[in-house]
């Protein structure tokens, strides 16, 4: 089934860079973006939207992408930048950093979603691109695996919040931990559940 899905993904023009992000929705941690230029001479089987892959498959494919891609780069925007800029602009900043950090300059940049950052590269937005375009799928896999590893690191530093289980998303367990322990330095103060909690605690 994976092989059939891979064949259906659009390869795109030569010199195409695919871009995707991970971590727009969570209450904690950075937003991570990845940019990938695939090598048509070294195809990678099994590429698809990272959310539709098992963790083991994501890790295996991430290793293949790093080994076989013409170029790739992963970048992030910090929690402080998210709170200062808002999550949309911070995501665009992370994407800009990822493309700018690649060792090869792309001819075209295709971005997952409905908008592109303001930059000089020729680009287009592709809605659900991580399930349509191979390079965007590869970028989604790198962004997801890198961010998950970052959140596991935060779990070691702040085990009370369970970051390794929910990766910062607003699960019932995470919200309960926030209520019991307050916010840590890696929580996004601009996000409503965190902000409301801080507002409530400041009243007492």
Curated annotation (Swiss-Prot):
Where does this one sit in the cell? Cytoplasm
Q: Which InterPro entries match?
A: RNase_HII, RNase_HII/HIII, RNase_HII/HIII_dom, RNaseH-like_sf, RNaseH_sf
Cofactor comment = Manganese or magnesium. Binds 1 divalent metal ion per monomer in the absence of substrate. May bind a second metal ion after substrate binding.
Q: Which reaction does it catalyse?
A: Endonucleolytic cleavage to 5'-phosphomonoester
Which GO molecular function entries does the Swiss-Prot or TrEMBL record give? Answer: manganese ion binding; RNA binding; RNA-DNA hybrid ribonuclease activity
HAMAP family to which the protein is assigned, alphabetical: RNase_HII_B
UniProt protein name: Ribonuclease HII
Specify the species: Thiobacillus denitrificans (strain ATCC 25259 / T1)
């Amino acid at each position: 089934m994976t092989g059939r899905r891979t064949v259906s993904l659009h390869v795109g023009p030569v010199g195409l860079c695919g871009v995707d992000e991970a971590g727009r929705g969570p209450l904690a941690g950075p937003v991570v973006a990845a940019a990938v230029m695939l090598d048509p001479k070294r195809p990678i089987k099994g590429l698809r939207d990272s959310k539709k892959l098992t963790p083991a498959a994501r890790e295996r494919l991430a290793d293949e992408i790093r080994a076989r891609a013409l170029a790739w780069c992963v970048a992030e925007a910090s929690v402080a930048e998210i709170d200062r800029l808002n999550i949309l602009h911070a995501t665009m900043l992370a994407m800009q950093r990822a493309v700018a950090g690649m060792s090869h300059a792309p001819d075209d940049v295709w971005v997952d979603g409905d908008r592109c950052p303001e930059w000089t590269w020729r680009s287009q937005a592709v809605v659900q691109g991580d399930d349509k375009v191979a390079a965007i799928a590869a970028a989604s896999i790198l962004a997801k695996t890198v961010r998950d590893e970052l959140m596991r690191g935060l779990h070691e530093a702040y085990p009370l919040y369970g970051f390794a289980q929910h990766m910062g998303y607003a699960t019932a367990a995470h919200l309960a931990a926030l209520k019991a322990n307050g916010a840590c330095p890696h929580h996004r103060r601009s996000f409503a559940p965190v902000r409301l909690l801080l507002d409530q605690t400041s009243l007492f």
